[in-house]
Amino acid sequence: KQLFINHTNAMKKILTSLLACCVFAIVCSAQSLPSVSILGDSYSTFEGYVQPDTNALWYFNKVRTQTDVTSVQQTWWHLFVKNQGYRLCVNNSFSGSTICNTGYRNEDYSERSFIARMDHLGNPDVIFIFGATNDAWAGAPIGEYQYENWKKADLYQFRPAMAYMLNYLVNRYPNVELYFLLNSELKESINESVKTICAYYKVDCIQLHDIDKKGGHPSILG
């Protein structure tokens, strides 16, 4: 009887060790996946998945008339992460945010702009920057192309702020893949500016088109 008990205890220890090894392997496998961070606006938000959680959102779990998206699994970035074998590092997206510090109604957006949040993206392997939409919609000052010696006042204009942001990101994340996602149906001055500045910093610019939208934002199909 004592031998049977000892044998049973030994088997339990072996099974426990095997289970622990399996869990450890799963965790390590998940952690070894390349990671993605997002610096974005409303197009990249979703309730419960944005850092910090005080950022304004557009997409929620509940049903809303403004959009048919009700699940994080329907968002562009979640589909990418899941289907391409990545894991999410940080999604620092803020609904209504501009790249520069000038927002809607000429308000000061220096606490929510892309350049205010670009230092809070974790340690990813890939960064997607999905912006310029609100700069276009808000009619932010376009400014001149400027690639150095930025002053505070310069960052309230789109072109200087865009260059300032990419200059920071390529130096802050030298071994990270950077991609700028350019929305469809924006002003040509914004499109031209984004492409020109991305080319200057050798950041890939992905021009989007034919996005199905509802309320000006990507739908499930979009």
What is the predicted role of each segment?
Residues 28-30:
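Boundary at the C-terminal end of the N-terminal hydrophobic targeting segment
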Residues 43-44:
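Short active-site segment of divalent metal-dependent hydrolases/proteases
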Residues 11-14:
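Positively charged n-region of N-terminal signal peptides that target proteins for export
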Residues 108-221:
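Alpha-helical cap/lid subdomain in secreted, periplasmic
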Residues 35-37, 49-147:
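Conserved SGNH/GDSL esterase-like catalytic core that processes O-acyl groups on lipids
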Residues 17-25:
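Bacterial N-terminal signal peptides
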Residues 39-40, 181:
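Short hydrophobic segments within beta-strands
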